[in-house]
Amino acid sequence: MKNTKSCIKQYVENGHLCNIAIRVGKEGRVLADIFEAADKIPCSETLFDMASITKVMVTSMLFLIAIDKKKIDLEDSVSKFFDTDEEKEKITIKDLLVHTIGIGHKSLIFEGCDYDNVQSYVLNIPSDVPIGSETLYSCPGYILLGKILEKVFGERLDNLFYELIAKPLDMKRSFFTPDKNNEFVNSNLLPEEIGIVNDYNCRFLGGISGNAGLFSCLEDVNKYVEMLLNFGYPLIGRETFEMAIRNYTETMSESRALGFVYVDEKYKQTGELFAKGSIGHCGHTGQSIFIDLKSGLYVIILSDATNSCNKKYGGGRYDVVMKMREDLHNAIKEDLEDA
């Protein structure tokens, strides 16, 4: 994997990256593991802040489980679960999952807002665009999804993840609010904040929410990916899985499956490696997972790239992290072709 290692070296030397763990696999077989670090080398069990990958590893997967169990329907309105005004009652579960609720990224750090009542604050955010008209990436929408899940199942989100996902998949090192005795790669500027979620909305809510908060490692993420390669088994049935991986926003600016990014010509961060119809997701802290369900190829990238860029530039350079993903995927493509 000389091209991939050369790409990593360039980003480290430029100060855009300190720690990274990459796994390249195909059809359940690991093709390569790459670990690099400016100080202590991470391993396959080192914990990373998964950031928005929480949306697919936890929240949308729990919804697919709920749909599979006939507990909820994609066309259910949010008004079935919480009081809403006339406009917001048009929002469906599908709108929430594919980011078409009309509300973009917003801070929920308000006096009086807390874990128990955050849904009311989300439902009172003014719309940026009409519901269902466009994809606007929405962390508030996924925070609301987390609260709906808790109402549907009668359990807190972290407990639902453990019982319905982590336990069946034997994911032993994936947690919300993990114990500080674990080995982490820090996603925060301050050393004393290691092991604390980076996302400010999730941190404000105590480290557990539908948009972020999960910490995981290469081995556990691989188990999640293997489940996807097995068409959802053992978590959901094949029919539910096939429903989940369709492109629901083809005519909009971003293509979205149920929770997942749907890779097509509009999406750049997978480079030339992944074919149209591949699925995946990114995390703002520097993480990504992508899977080509037809070929069985997958790539997991866990890193501290965003924190490294924040240290160098003082923030505001997520474009560098996005370009890093594109470059790494292209380098992996070259290495696989050379093998």
Regions found by a protein language model. Name each.
Residues 2-9:
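Short amphipathic alpha-helical segments
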Residues 8, 22, 28, 55, ...:
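Residue-level preference for non-acidic, small/hydrophobic
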Residues 9-42, 98, 110-112, 260-262, ...:
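A short, well-structured edge-of-sheet supersecondary motif
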Residues 9-11, 47, 274-279, 286:
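Short, P/G- and charge-enriched loop/turn segments at secondary-structure junctions
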Residues 14-18, 26, 40-139, 155:
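Active-site-proximal loop and beta-strand segments within enzyme catalytic domains
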Residues 88-277:
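Short, surface-exposed loop or secondary-structure junction motifs
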Residues 206-213, 276-291, 303-308:
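Glycine-rich phosphate/pyrophosphate-binding beta-alpha loops
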Residues 230, 239-240, 245, 265-268, ...:
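Short, gly/Ser/Thr-rich active-site loops of penicillin-recognizing serine hydrolases
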